[in-house]
């Protein structure tokens, strides 16, 4: 234990940076969990689609969507999300699953929908990259 204390004392800047980064990671994970936005695996998304209890919103750029997308997904880019709310109103009784490229923007987009009154919002964990990595079907 004394070795750790000596290391921290001798490398104060490095140790402080480590602690700060660790705290930020923990805070970010807590924020995700408290937001009420579910992170779904590609398999869970497939099950939701098979049971027809969810719709998919692909928020990637139009050219990325046109190259490949999950069958049945609607393409609504993030900048148009708030103007497309009327189009989504009819799906309020279903789960809305947000897809992005790698799962990094989907949470914030899902939060925007939640603030607009859509209670059952989730995100594809890992985004389209995770879907493709699982070898699941796509439309071209």
Please identify what each model-predicted range represents:
Residues 57:
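Active-site flanking residues adjacent to catalytic metal/cofactor-binding acidic residues
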Residues 1-39, 48, 54, 62-95, ...:
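Rhodanese-like catalytic fold shared by cysteine-dependent sulfurtransferases
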């Amino acid at each position: 234990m004394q070795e750790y204390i000596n290391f921290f004392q001798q490398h104060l800047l490095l140790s402080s940076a480590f602690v700060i980064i660790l705290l930020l990671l923990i805070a970010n994970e807590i924020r995700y969990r408290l937001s009420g936005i579910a992170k779904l695996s590609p398999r869970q998304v497939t099950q939701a689609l098979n049971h027809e209890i969810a719709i998919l919103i692909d928020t990637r750029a139009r050219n990325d969507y046109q190259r490949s997308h999950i069958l049945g997904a609607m393409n609504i880019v993030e900048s148009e999300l708030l103007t497309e709310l009327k189009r989504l109103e009819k799906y309020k009784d279903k789960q809305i699953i947000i897809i992005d490229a790698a799962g990094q923007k989907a949470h914030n987009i899902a939060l925007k929908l939640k603030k607009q009154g859509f209670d059952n919002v989730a995100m594809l964990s890992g985004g389209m990259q995770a879907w493709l990595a699982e070898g699941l079907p796509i439309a071209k």
